[in-house]
Amino acid sequence: APEAPGSVFDSRLIVLGIKGKRVSLPATLKLTAALRGLLMRICPEQPPPEWFSGHRLDGTPTAVPHLALTPLPFVGSEHADGRIMGLALVLPTGLDQQEAGHCLEPILRDPATGLLREHPLFDGQWFECAIELETRERSPKNLDPDTWTWESRVWASVTPVVLNRHFDGKDKWERAAESVKDACLHIGLPRPREVLLHPVSLIEGVPHAREYPQLMRKNGGGRRSHNHAVIVFDEPVRGPVLVGAGRFRGYGLCRPMDEKGEDRG
């Protein structure tokens, strides 16, 4: 069978396991910010390349897809509690593997010994934990890249999808849904047939949308609206599906579902 359409994000996720005190999904933005700070600081190439940093050398935002960071939470089963079990480094599709390895390998493993490197992540009241490359032969389901990239027609959000603007008026939900369809096109996926927005996720263990801090607009432009989403395509697509304005920072992460509206895993 021909391969299902994918997005600008590579489905070969690099998974980092988290150790330490429980970190819950609403800490996503804080956690990805701490990870990004760490990566930028210890990248062997300084200043870090555009695909890694998301910025050109002059400091302006890049126009090309770049490294995204996303939480991998314990969700989608009966006892799921939404805690973050790991983080994924999501590379842009088409990035040269040697180039990626040159920047990431020394961060993940000690260049002298080849042993895994553990890095602390800390943010005051939010979390205190450590991350390390996940290398177990049989990873827990939520740390298995397949769980997040499996081909599926229906996807449901685990972290809220940030809308590109605030919608008013009686048709605001239709217009907001259309904007999420456009956001899927924007990452190289086909335009979905249907998008349903709701403050509650379809997936067990995922917190209500209002429990997640809102993404702030750049230059003090206020808070951005967000909501959970169910996205239905005409044909199966391959993940990861990261959509909306927060997609490089862990918002808009969706999970493949089967046709019955149950978790695919």
Question: Residue locations for each model-derived region?
Answer:
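RNA-interacting cores
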Residues: 1-265
